[in-house]
Each structure stands twice: as C-alpha cells, then as structure tokens.
From Swiss-Prot:
The name this protein goes by in its record: Small proline-rich protein 4
Principal location class: cytoplasm
Organism from which the protein derives: Mus musculus
Protein function: Cross-linked envelope protein of keratinocytes. Involved in UV-induced cornification.
Any one GO BP annotation for this protein: keratinization
Length: 76
C-alpha cells in the first residue's frame, strides 16, 4: 500500500511542475523578444522598447559619417 502512494506522487510532481514552469515562462520571453530587446539586460521593460528604435537610428546615422562614407566628415 505504501508503495502505491509513492508512485502516484512521483507522477504528479514532474508533470505539475513542468506545466507550471512552461506556461508562465514561455509567453513573457516570446512576447518581449518580438518587441526588440536583443541587447537589453531587461527582456520586459517599458524603457527597452524606447531604447531599441531610438538607439537603432542614432547608431547607424552617427556611424555612417565617420565610418567610411565621407572622409570630410571625419576631419570636420
């Protein structure tokens, strides 16, 4: 009889923990990654959304000048 109770508890622990960790862990990272947070420490922050598009436009615009497009821009 005691062996029967042990088998019932083992099958209920792994299945209940796996379903509870997979449900709340998959939606947040998947929804946050689609917003635009590849180089941010916080995958779910209101500031991360603003830094993604703002940094993306300032990075290529500022790097385009002294990068290798206009040698006159580097001297100025």
């Amino acid at each position: 009889m005691p062996s029967h109770q042990h088998q019932n508890q083992q099958q209920c622990t792994p299945q209940a923990q796996q379903q509870q960790v997979k449900q709340p862990c998959q939606p947040p990272p998947t929804k946050c990654q689609e917003a635009c947070v590849p180089k941010t420490k916080d995958p779910c922050v209101p500031q991360a959304k603003k830094q993604c598009p703002a940094r993306s436009t300032t990075n290529p615009a500022q790097e385009k000048c002294p990068a290798q497009q206009d040698p006159k821009c580097k001297q100025k």
